[in-house]
């Protein structure tokens, strides 16, 4: 119950942060919360086939899985915008398409410039930004910074505007 209450609060934060039209769409994305699955966090599932091949229900396609309600509270301490991050994957996949040329161009330019090679991390120190993983993670990480707070630098919108020309 504590995790579901925290998830409700996080979704309220998302509702208050993103444009209303975007949140109206994002409310359609199903979020599956599992009690104690051995799963490392939250994940957006774009593919029904992948789910079937890996023993998960195909109904989870185009939805978000939070793999362990008991761990949700500790996850969001390190990644406060975790739900927004996964919803950003849904938006990217369903509304923009993973082949969106603007996102591809921004990701390529950012990777070529090296601006995410070593950045500050919210809990201290520096690390390679998770945004470097691929263009999907780039979009989701920058969405966190734009609308809420990211766990990797740039943490918030003003820093993002200064750090990444997009």
PLM feature spans:
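Metalloprotease/metallohydrolase-associated module, dominated by Zn2+-dependent proteases
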Residues: 52-60, 67-69, 73, 77, ...
């Amino acid at each position: 119950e504590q995790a579901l209450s925290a998830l409700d609060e996080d979704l309220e934060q998302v509702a208050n942060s993103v444009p209303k039209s975007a949140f109206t769409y994002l409310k359609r994305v199903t979020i599956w919360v599992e009690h104690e699955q051995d799963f490392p966090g939250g994940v957006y599932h774009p593919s029904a086939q992948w789910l079937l091949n890996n023993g998960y229900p195909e109904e989870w396609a185009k939805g978000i899985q939070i793999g362990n309600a008991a761990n949700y509270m500790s996850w969001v301490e390190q990644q406060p915008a975790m739900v927004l991050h996964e919803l950003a994957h849904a938006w990217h996949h369903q509304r923009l398409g993973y082949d969106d040329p603007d996102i591809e161009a921004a990701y390529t330019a950012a990777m070529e410039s090296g601006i995410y090679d070593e950045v500050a991390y919210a809990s201290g120190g520096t690390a390679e930004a998770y945004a470097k993983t691929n263009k999907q993670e780039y979009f989701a990480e920058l969405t966190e910074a734009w609308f809420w707070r990211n766990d990797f630098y740039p943490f918030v919108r003003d820093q993002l505007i200064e750090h990444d020309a997009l």
